């Protein structure tokens, strides 16, 4: 889109760059950090990156303080990683994030923040729906290996679903991201298969970040459970966006960034953490009324594709790149019409690359990914 205006180069290790090469860089773009630590090294490395006048922009899609239930919490605590990431946020010339909620936290450390929502690019084939059909209504969970507490929200509802014999052979539950030998997904499987008792369960293999969305072609309804805690409230609405682009219905936890996108009962379903029975009731209603699922999916797709225009958001991002490189402040930039979101209307310290070629497997079939 901007090939005539800029040249983008992917650098595997900046330490291998010569001074001559460093002089050619106007702007460094980093996801969360430019160095993993220690904290004492963050500023010296930033100074090296800037020594010939280059600027630094961070992309931030997750909060840097993890809850005690997060699978990375121990690692973050032992390595002081939350402080390391916060130091990066403070020192960056500008920060890009995805929602007003996370922006408000970043503003406490860095005033140069702008919002560029997650939006799929159709040049990536995985975002072009190639739906499959089934006589059963198919539910799917697409989450990385850091959601043990979130998946636990489904344990009782899915157990009740399994025990409802009026629904037998009328639905499927797919766990996407299955990775043979991964203990987290083995735990997830215990929930989705009701400890092996649900015959309506199957797997979708793990895939990398460039193909995992293809797994949506084998489901009809996405499940997006999240605990209502600060870390999760500062995540993006990515799971809603994925479902919308793939023209799927969604049942999601009633967490702020999801609630900004979904009108409960119209273009999706929102479930309060204190109402776990609603997961079961909503899934049963969808199994009994598949036409409702199709209507919800179409409404969600129309809404989200209207809200998230790739050209507008990409232009906003590129204008930010140009103006930071030219040393125009974010305050000045925001005075220029950019299509910036005006209110809370808009993944993860999560490894989105832990899924595979998107082909469903039987419950007992191994994955070779």
Placement of each model-derived feature along the sequence:
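Conserved catalytic-core segment of nucleotide-activated headgroup transferases in glycan assembly
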Residues: 1, 121-126, 132-214
């Amino acid at each position: 889109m901007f090939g005539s205006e800029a040249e983008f180069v992917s650098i595997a290790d900046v330490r291998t760059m010569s001074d001559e090469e460093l002089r050619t860089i106007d702007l460094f773009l980093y996801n969360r950090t430019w160095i993993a630590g220690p904290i004492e090294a963050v500023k010296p490395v930033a100074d090296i990156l800037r020594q010939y006048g280059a600027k630094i922009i961070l992309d931030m899609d997750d909060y840097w303080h993890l809850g005690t239930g997060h699978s990375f919490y121990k690692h973050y605590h032992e390595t002081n990683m939350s402080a390391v990431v916060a130091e990066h946020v403070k020192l960056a010339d500008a920060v890009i994030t995805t929602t007003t909620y996370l922006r408000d936290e970043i503003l406490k450390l860095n005033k140069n923040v702008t919002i560029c929502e997650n939006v799929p690019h159709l040049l990536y084939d995985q975002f072009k729906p190639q739906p499959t059909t089934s006589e059963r209504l198919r539910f799917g969970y697409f989450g990385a290996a850091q959601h043990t507490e979130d998946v636990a929200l489904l344990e009782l509802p899915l157990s009740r679903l399994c025990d409802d014999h009026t629904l037998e052979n009328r639905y499927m539950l797919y766990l996407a991201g299955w990775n043979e030998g991964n203990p987290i997904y083995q735990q997830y499987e215990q929930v989705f298969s009701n400890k092996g008792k649900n015959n309506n369960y199957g797997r979708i293999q793990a895939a990398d970040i460039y193909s995992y969305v293809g797994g949506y072609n084998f489901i009809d309804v996405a499940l997006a459970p999240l605990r209502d805690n600060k870390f999760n409230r500062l995540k993006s609405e990515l799971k809603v966006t994925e479902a919308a682009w793939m023209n799927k219905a969604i049942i999601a936890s009633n967490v702020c960034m999801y609630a900004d996108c979904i009108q409960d009962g119209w273009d999706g379903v929102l479930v309060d953490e204190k109402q776990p029975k609603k997961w079961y009731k909503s899934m049963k209603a969808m199994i009994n009324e598949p036409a409702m699922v199709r209507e919800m999916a179409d409404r969600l797709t129309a809404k989200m594709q209207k809200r998230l225009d790739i050209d507008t958001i990409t232009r906003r991002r590129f204008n930010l790149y140009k103006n930071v490189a030219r040393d125009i402040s974010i305050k000045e930039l925001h005075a220029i019409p950019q299509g910036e979101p005006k209110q809370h209307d808009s993944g993860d310290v999560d490894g989105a690359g832990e899924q595979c070629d998107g082909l469903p497997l039987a419950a007992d079939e191994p994955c070779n990914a």
